Structure formats: C-alpha cells, structure tokens
C-alpha cells in the first residue's frame, strides 16, 4: 500500500485537467495538479480523494485560511491538509519571481 498525497498550486493560466502529473515509488504516490482558482481546487480534491484515496493534501502558499477550510470540508476528516508557507524573506523572494513571470 502506498502513501498517497496531492499537491495543489494556484497558477493563473492553469487548466487542472491538463496541468498535472503523478510521481511514484514503491511506497509513495504524489499527484500534482495546477489550478486556476478555488473552484478547480475543490473539484480536484473531491475527484482524487474519491478515485485515488488521497490521504494528505499539500497546498501552495496562495491558499487563504478560508480556502483551506473549504478544502478540508471537501476532502473529509480523514485527509490531512498542510499549507507550504515560507518565512517572510522567502515569501518576498517568491512574490518577486512570480511578478517577473507575469503572474500579476
């Protein structure tokens, strides 16, 4: 049996059906999905928890506390939710890089 995790990131030009991959070893299966908005994130969560038995979800720092609560509700009480947040300096560096890439 493998530990199954889903990583979701907000990306302005993402299409969740197109932008994803699966990485896998004998003991670990990581699903990666890029989503444009919260509605796509919720759909991905519901679909993969049901179809793949996801046990843990990792979210990019762009998810708000409200978003995280909605994702927890969609995933169910038996799925762990983690948000990948950096310290102040790291967040600033990432924001500048995203700005240069044209995210906003």
Please report, for each region that a protein language model flagged, where it lies by residue.
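Glycine-rich phosphate-binding "P-loop"
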Residues: 23-39
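Amphipathic, hydrophobic secondary-structure cores in small proteins
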Residues: 45-46, 51-63
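Structural preference for beta-strand elements that scaffold enzyme active sites
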Residues: 4-6, 56, 78-82
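Alpha-helix-loop-beta-strand connector modules within alpha/beta enzyme cores
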Residues: 68-86
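N-terminal basic/disordered segments at the start of proteins
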Residues: 1-17
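Short, ordered loop/turn segments at secondary-structure junctions
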Residues: 62-63, 86-89
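Short, charged, surface-exposed secondary-structure boundary motifs
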Residues: 89-96
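A polyampholytic, Gly/Pro-enriched intrinsically disordered region
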Residues: 54, 100-104
């Amino acid at each position: 049996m493998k530990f199954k995790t889903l990583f979701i990131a907000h990306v302005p030009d993402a299409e969740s059906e197109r932008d994803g991959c699966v990485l896998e070893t004998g003991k670990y299966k990581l699903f990666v999905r890029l989503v444009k908005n919260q509605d796509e994130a919720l759909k991905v969560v519901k679909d993969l928890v049901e179809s793949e038995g996801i046990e843990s979800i990792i979210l990019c720092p762009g998810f708000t506390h409200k978003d995280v609560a909605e994702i927890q509700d969609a995933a169910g009480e038996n799925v762990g939710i983690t948000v990948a947040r950096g310290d102040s300096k790291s967040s600033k560096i990432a924001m500048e890089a995203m700005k240069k890439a044209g995210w906003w």
